Curated annotation (Swiss-Prot):
Keyword Transmembrane: yes
Protein name as catalogued: Sodium-dependent dicarboxylate transporter SdcS
UniProt gene name: sdcS
This protein's GO CC annotations: plasma membrane
Alphabetical list of CDD domains matching this protein: SLC13_permease
Source organism: Staphylococcus saprophyticus subsp. saprophyticus (strain ATCC 15305 / DSM 20229 / NCIMB 8711 / NCTC 7292 / S-41)
Bilayer topology: Multi-pass membrane protein
């Protein structure tokens, strides 16, 4: 312990507090409270809550929702396990039959995300993601500002197609290597505090860029795929991959640029203009990768093919007779099968580009959570609970939509600092779908900012895995992360509200003052 510096001690204490208790006990205090509170709310709702104009089935679904939401928030049992409850409770309450419930777990949306995961695993297996990232950084130059921006662009781009966590885990070791090189090669006129500020800026910028980049595509982050699924389930309308990119990519670009300016020139302002050895290290790592291998080329071609099909489906494939019923999930499965089909040249390592061994690396729990959320939303709709909630929410009719959007964005963004972003989106979006009918606005005016905000957690290590990875480097304290993250939260709120008001309506072709009827 005597050899630990203050940062190491803080990190050790933090990790002990949040992990050791879980290792030594089956349940921590919060989980025990949730474990009891969930079923208790279920029973009390059934016994004591009998409002007018709400059927017994509606009351039953409300009770289920409170139980599931409590377990999701407290993580009393694994979130994915909680997401299996609709399969049990909805048929028991005669709300939906087993076939109707289980069909939600096989929704096209889930297969879109599954295909995205498989493509990401293929990129990681053959190291294409590292080559792309290093190329981007190498292109942008040697100044500290450009290196910082290069890392953010590379991480943000990767995060559009692989998980936020994977993107950050790829980039952090490269960033730490550059920091180490800078410390070893620092010039006599380079102040130690300048290097310290730069290393804090770099690791935090990588973490934030991983979170921001997820907003770029529908497969970039779970809240967006939940948005697509819940919107389609509630209203029978679709958000296409291509149209979301027209919204998401500019959002990512603007946020990355604003956060880069804030981190480089305000939060971690320093006098070091160039980084000793930084460019040389990047070139060395590129050299170590060697020439692009056959397998990398195959994955790149399949990736470009998938992107082309997703982007053109709306205005090209839909107009061809034999592809008119093709959905984004269909394309995802097509590219997945291609990756399983194409042989690899390096057969000592793997016989094909990917094989079924990758199945163990797929986040099945996330896919089950999606299914549980869709099943619960179906139950809310079919039981009449959605219409009843809409009637109750008419109390806020007449409030400015801008105020509602702002409040939703702030509430969800700060809520997701302490709860799972996926669980938050799964809980909040069906409620907002109903709220849109009550306040006479288009549902996407409320659902889009909530989904985007659910992805944005910058203040705490527990807020999102990228933050935890950054904190784990020992380069940044919780206090500093919270103070910097607070201002990044505010930047995100402003950008999200502006995007929702000025970009979403024309791109998606909606009139924000026209509500949609629930299915």
């Amino acid at each position: 312990m005597n050899n630990l510096n203050k940062g190491d001690m803080r990190r050790s204490q933090y990790l002990m507090f949040f992990s050791n208790k879980k290792e030594n006990k089956s349940y921590n205090v919060g989980q025990l409270v949730g474990l009891i509170l969930g079923p208790l709310l279920f029973v009390l709702t059934l016994l004591l809550f009998q409002p007018d104009n709400l059927s017994d089935k509606g009351v039953f679904v409300l009770a289920i929702t409170l139980w599931i939401a409590t377990w999701w928030i407290t993580e009393a049992i694994p979130i994915a396990a909680t997401s299996l409850l609709p399969l049990i409770l909805l048929p028991v309450g005669h709300v939906l039959n087993p076939e109707e419930v289980s069909a939600q777990y096989g929704n096209d949306i889930i297969f879109l995300f599954l295909g995205g995961f498989i493509l990401a695993i293929a990129m990681e297996r053959w190291n294409l993601h590292t080559r792309v990232a290093l190329r981007i950084i190498n292109t942008l130059g040697t100044s500290t500002g450009r290196i910082l921006l290069g890392f953010m662009i590379a991480t943000g781009f990767l995060s559009m197609f692989v998980s936020n966590t994977a993107a950050v885990m790829i980039m952090i070791p490269i960033g730490l290597a550059i920091i180490k090189e800078a410390n070893e090669l620092k010039h006599g006129d380079t102040k130690p505090e300048s290097i310290s500020k730069f290393e804090q800026a770099l690791v935090l910028a990588i973490g934030y860029a991983g979170t921001i980049g997820g907003l770029g595509t529908l497969i970039g982050t779970p809240p967006l795929i939940i948005l697509k699924g819940q919107y389609q389930s509630a209203f029978g309308e679709e958000i296409s991959f291509a149209k979301w990119m027209i919204i998401g990519v500019p959002t990512v670009i603007v946020l990355l640029f604003l956060v880069w300016i804030y981190i480089r020139y305000i939060a971690f302002k320093h006098d070091m203009k160039t980084l000793p050895g930084g460019q040389d290290l990047i070139r060395k790592k590129l050299s170590e990768l060697g020439k692009m291998k056959y397998e990398e080329k195959v994955v790149l071609i399949v990736f470009l093919l998938a992107s082309f099909l997703w982007i053109t489906r709306e205005f090209l494939l839909k107009h061809w007779t034999f592809t008119s019923e093709v959905a984004d999930g269909t394309i995802a499965m097509f590219i997945s099968v291609l990756l399983f089909l194409i042989p690899a040249k390096n057969k000592e390592k793997h016989k094909r580009i990917i094989d079924w061994e990758v199945a163990k690396d797929l986040p099945w729990g996330v896919l089950i959570l999606f299914g549980g959320g869709l099943a619960l939303a179906k139950g809310i709709s079919e039981s009449g609970l959605a219409n009843w909630l809409g009637e109750q929410l008419k109390l806020i009719e007449g409030v400015s939509p801008l105020v509602i959007v702002l409040v939703i964005t702030i509430f969800v963004l700060f809520l997701t600092e302490i709860t799972s972003n996926t669980a938050t989106a799964t809980m909040i979006l069906p409620i907002l779908a109903t709220l849109s009918v009550a306040v006479n606005v288009h549902p996407l005016l409320l659902m889009v900012p909530a989904a985007m905000a659910a992805n944005c957690a910058y203040m705490l290590p527990v807020g999102t895995p990228p933050n935890a990875i950054v904190f784990g480097t020992g380069k940044i304290s919780i206090k500093k992360m919270a103070s910097v993250g607070f201002w990044v939260n505010l930047l995100s709120i402003v950008v999200i509200v502006l995007v929702v008001y000025f970009l979403v309506p024309p791109v998606l072709g909606i009139d924000v003052t026209q509500p949609l009827p629930l299915k």
